[in-house]
């Protein structure tokens, strides 16, 4: 036999309680599982679905706008209604409060001075004794499920969903990404009710509960659900933080020219065997990007540079990284493809240059033009290109160094004479003389498209060559 559930109408029609309806009569069939008094300014935080708020008016705001919002918040929290004590502390009720309660069919009741709130509470408790017993049994089962919260949080989420008949998911506030969630519930209606709650131990995460209409999770259980999920999440978040820290340390080692141990534990067994690219993003996006990469367990390395935050991504992770950054609305510059990790600094510099010159029109800017990385797969090949193109101009003699820096400045300033002269602090005549000397030494002319392309390749390969020379 179906258990009869206490409603607001039952309380109003009980003459011994002396209650009458002020507004929201359309909601008299709302269920009442508990009645609780609260005089705090935000009672919607402390009471939950199917609970009746009892107050002498201390928590009721005075202005019309605030009273309307008062009703809105109570209704959105799922309360059964509000019972106002006929007391001097009750402020005058406004038309806006009545209208909002009627519009939402949210019962606003008035109790006479002779009715203590304890009488209402005992009436509700007696009528819902069986329901409360079921809640205690559910609580016992909930803590049985919590025994593997640390070892298998996904299994725990699925079992909690089955126990509560509600969808559960934890998402990251900063990125909006789901950290852990139960499997999709069958036959979940489109009119599902969703509520979010902060977790006790992690201010950056929220629990979202998706409930069937009329089957909301009670506030009695909710407190314990939050505690159990918080325990499971703390272990998971620690693992994510450790992964992020290892990723940063490994990338720093690669930048220093060392091959870090355990690289496969993050990049996977294939690692960078098919090539890798660097992605540069703004430093202010670093925390969000690093957190998102860890939550998604992407096989990438991520860490800061001097002017950008970098991601080293194997070729096979490119689409995943691009989709992630697009979802975060983060702008990125992407290098060409490299094979040798000893070229990591050159690849990162290339990505940083692309990012700084990429503008703001697109979120993802790829390397365009002649991909130097196709020719310089290693420092050895970079050295070959530099020596072949520059010849004696690659030497360390001070006069040669001045000429080489002049050539590189000319290329960096897109062959603009005035800008190059200004950057070097010399006259145009001096610049002309130096370019003539460069032609004499290298046998290459900046007026020739072929020679200019060769100079540009040598310019791009120089960082790897100079690191090798050092």
Curated annotation (Swiss-Prot):
Which Pfam families does this chain map to? Answer: HTH_30, PucR
Q: Name one GO biological process term.
A: nicotine catabolic process
Pathway noted in the entry:
Alkaloid degradation; nicotine degradation [regulation]
InterPro entries in UniProt: CdaR-like_regulators, PucR_C-HTH_dom, PucR_C-HTH_sf, PucR_dom, Trans_act_PmfR
Residue stretches in coiled coil: none
For this UniProt record, the keywords arranged alphabetically read as follows: Activator, DNA-binding, Plasmid, Transcription, Transcription regulation
Instruction: Say what happens when this gene is deleted.
Output: Cells lacking this gene do not produce the MabO protein in the presence of nicotine, in contrast to the wild-type. Transcription of the nepAB genes and of the mao-ORF55-nbr operon is abolished in the mutant strain.
Molecular functions (GO terms): DNA binding; DNA-binding transcription factor activity
Nucleus as a keyword?
A: no
Superkingdom assignment:
Bacteria
Q: How does it assemble?
A: Forms oligomers in solution, probably homotetramers.
Q: What is the recorded function of this protein according to its Swiss-Prot or TrEMBL entry? A: Transcriptional regulator involved in the activation of the purU-mabO-folD-nepA-nepB and mao-ORF55-nbr operons implicated in the nicotine catabolic pathway. The sequence GTTT-14 bp-AAAC seems to be the core binding site of the regulator upstream of the -35 promoter region of the operon.
In its UniProt entry, what is this protein called?
A: Transcriptional activator PmfR
Phylogenetic classification of the source organism: Bacteria, Bacillati, Actinomycetota, Actinomycetes, Micrococcales
State which gene encodes it: pmfR
